[in-house]
Every structure is written in C-alpha cells, then in structure tokens.
Design a protein with these regions (language model features):
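Generic long, charged, amphipathic alpha-helical segments
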Residues: 254-325
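A conserved active-site cap/scaffold subdomain adjacent to cofactor or substrate pockets
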Residues: 25, 29-32, 38-56, 185
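Catalytic nucleotidyl-transfer cores of nucleotide-processing enzymes
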Residues: 184-186, 192-193, 197-257
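A glycine-rich phosphate-binding loop feature that marks nucleotide/adenosyl-phosphate handling sites
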Residues: 64-79, 91-98, 153-160, 220-231, ...
Length: 384
C-alpha cells in the first residue's frame, strides 16, 4: 500500500505451525485481498458479494445479503463462542444476579471471585438428556476447563437436580423464572471465577447437545459477521497483555484514550465472517498512523529498541504516508469443506497432512541435497 499499489488480490499457499483440527490443516490455500482507502463496511460489502456469487454459481444457493453483524461481546454472551453456529437456539443465559448470594458454595465463590454463573435451558429435551447423557456432558464441560456441571431436570415425575437442594425456595423459584424453565426442560449450569471458562464450557455444551438431539439443519447456510474483537487479551502465562489478532489492527477511534488505562476494553476494527459455527475468513482495518502504531506496541510491552529491531521497516514506511487500508483473507479449503457439507477439511484436500505435518502418500518432507547447506537449509529429520 505504501508503495503505491492501491489494492491486490492473491491466491496464496500458506504453512502455519498450528494444531491439526477437523477444519484446519498446517498447509492450506488462502484467498487474500488488501485495499487502500476502504472502511470496514467496504471490505464487508465486497466479500459478501464474492460469497454470494460463489454460492449462487457453484451451488445454486441464493445467499441473503447483507449478513447479520454481531459484536464479539454479544457472541460470547449469547453463544459462548466468537464463531457461533446460529442455526439453532440453546443460547446462554446469565443468572449471576439470581444466584449471587446462593447457599451453594460453588456459585457463591465464583461470583465473589469476579466470575459468573450462566446456563443453557435445553427446552423440551429432558427425555433425550437422561442422567447418563448428562454424565457425558460433565466430561465435555471439564474438557473445556470447567470444574464440573450442575444440572436440573424438570419432568412430569418431578424435579431432579445436582444443586437445588442447596438453594432456598425463593432462589429456586427465581432461577426457574429467570431461565424460563418448564416441565420437560433441562438446565445446564456452569460457574467459574473466569468468565472465559464459563463461555468455553457452555459453548461446547451447546454444540454437544445440538448434535446429540439433532437440532442442526445441515441444509442451512447461516452467515454472520463477528465484529469489535478486543484488541488486547491478557496472557496469564506471560503476565502481560497480548494482541488478540495482531498488533497492526487499527483500534476503534473512540477507544484510543483507554489504551494505557484500560487495555482490556479497547476494541479493534477486526471482523470475522462466520458460517455455521466456522470462521470462513477474517480481516481488519490496519493501522496507518505511526503514532498510533507506536502506542500499541508500547502497550504490548515492546521497548523502543525492540520495536525498532522487529518492525523498523514498517515504522519507516509509515513516514512516507501510508493510506488508510484494510482487507480480508478466506481459507479456500475450509470454504469448499463447508459448501460440500463435509465434517473434515481432509475430505477436500488431495494430499492432506497428518498430525506431525507429514504427508504419507509422497513421504514429504523429503531429505534435501547437501548443497542446500550453502544457503543454510539443513537436512530435516523425517517425521515418520
């Protein structure tokens, strides 16, 4: 952009050192675009048009545009995920205020520590969610960091609960009212001192229940934009603030005065396109002001020397007048996987990689010739 190229579009092969998942491969194809003099709305509109045309011409499916937009905070509060599957309900409900003074120590201690108590009301699913099935859901919750899973089943035979015996009659009534609980419902409750744990556990439980009970329509294509991601996230491991996406995303102008005083509340001009619970693509408006970039790097703990050493070329480029610019990239393989309604990205890649990033069919990565050592490429150890 600084060099005078107003915009570009590329299909790029990428390799990332990331964990293998059903929708992720270490080597993949990316559809990437960057444009000068655009706003968030411009980027979204262009990519909605691209997706609409692809789905119409390839699948004969008419995708409705513009896509729904949802702030990150709303996505987490309602779905427990920053890439929510909106083809079904089972939305999260915050019952922290109802149970703030609860006699149940698990709830009370979580709230006192600054956390929350939230639940999913699996309406009409008491028949499907037996005690045995709920035990399986406990394991799901623990996998995502929760210490356990509290539940209440309301059936024609009465109410069975793992925790309501610790509540007063008033608290029980208030909880049932807040949750909209009726006969046939199951309340799945998670409490923790960390809201991130509550969201992760309930988000996973929501998907597990939907898959178990057949609540997902496989023929639906539900698109939405998740916007206003936090610029910073705090790393307990490193004891410092880190960039949630990358340090070159432009923060919202109205949040700039909070960068030093309240970094956790700073929102980024970042956006993800989500389809049926999968991130289809993502992007952002980039920083083009050297003063703003300097502030963000300092807030991330970069000394002036380290910032210069790591990003000096970028800071120098800014001095020549970088235009406002932004863009977005799609995962091409993932898009094909979702369009074909496949559960694994391996189904749409000719030679997918295995867990250690090797490819058994061709035996790659292969050994290299000795002469490559002259350009500092060493001979690797075969992964298998």
């Amino acid at each position: 952009m600084v060099g005078g190229i107003e915009r570009y579009y590329q299909i790029a092969r990428c390799f990332r050192d990331e964990d293998l998942r059903a929708d992720r491969q270490p080597e993949f194809t990316q559809i990437d675009m960057e444009m000068s003099f655009v706003t968030e709305d411009d980027v979204m509109a262009m990519n909605e048009g691209l997706v609409k045309r692809v789905f119409r011409e390839v699948l004969g499916v008419d995708v409705e545009t513009p896509f729904r937009r949802m702030p990150y905070s709303e996505a987490m509060a309602r779905y427990g995920s920053d890439k929510p599957d909106t083809r079904f309900g089972l939305e999260l409900q915050d019952v922290t205020d109802v149970l703030r003074e609860s006699g149940f120590a698990v709830f009370k201690s979580a709230v006192e520590a600054g956390g929350s108590v939230r639940l999913i009301n699996a309406k009409g699913l008491a028949g499907a969610l037996t005690r045995k099935e709920i035990d399986k859901l406990v394991d799901v919750a623990k996998t995502y960091g929760a210490k356990g899973l509290a539940y209440t089943r309301l059936t024609a035979d009465g109410v069975t609960s793992s925790f309501e015996k610790f509540l007063s009659e008033e608290e029980k009534a208030a909880l049932h009212k807040a949750a909209g609980a009726e006969t046939g419902d199951v309340l799945l409750v998670v409490a923790d001192a960390k809201n991130s744990t509550v969201f992760a556990a309930l988000g996973a439980l929501r998907l597990a229940v939907a898959n178990k009970c057949g609540l997902i329509d496989p023929d639906k294509f539900n698109f939405l934009w998740v916007t206003d991601f936090p610029f910073f996230e705090y790393s307990e491991e490193e004891g410092r603030w880190m960039a949630m996406h990358h340090p070159f995303t432009m923060p919202r102008a109205e949040d700039l005065d909070k960068v030093e005083s309240d970094p956790g509340s700073v929102r980024a001009l970042a956006y993800d396109m989500v389809l049926n619970g999968c991130e289809l693509g993502g992007g952002s408006i980039r920083i083009n002001d050297p003063a703003v970039q300097d502030r963000m790097l300092k807030a991330l703990g970069f000394s002036e020397e380290r910032a210069r050493e790591s990003f000096g070329f970028l800071m120098d480029a800014y001095q020549y007048g970088a235009p406002p610019h932004g863009g977005m990239a799609f995962g091409f393989d993932r898009m094909v996987m979702l369009m074909l309604k496949r559960d694994s990205i391996r189904d749409v890649i000719a030679f997918p990689k295995v867990q250690n990033a090797g490819e058994p069919m061709s035996g790659c990565p292969e050994t290299v010739e000795e002469k490559l050592s002259l350009i500092h490429i060493s001979e690797p150890t075969r992964p298998y």
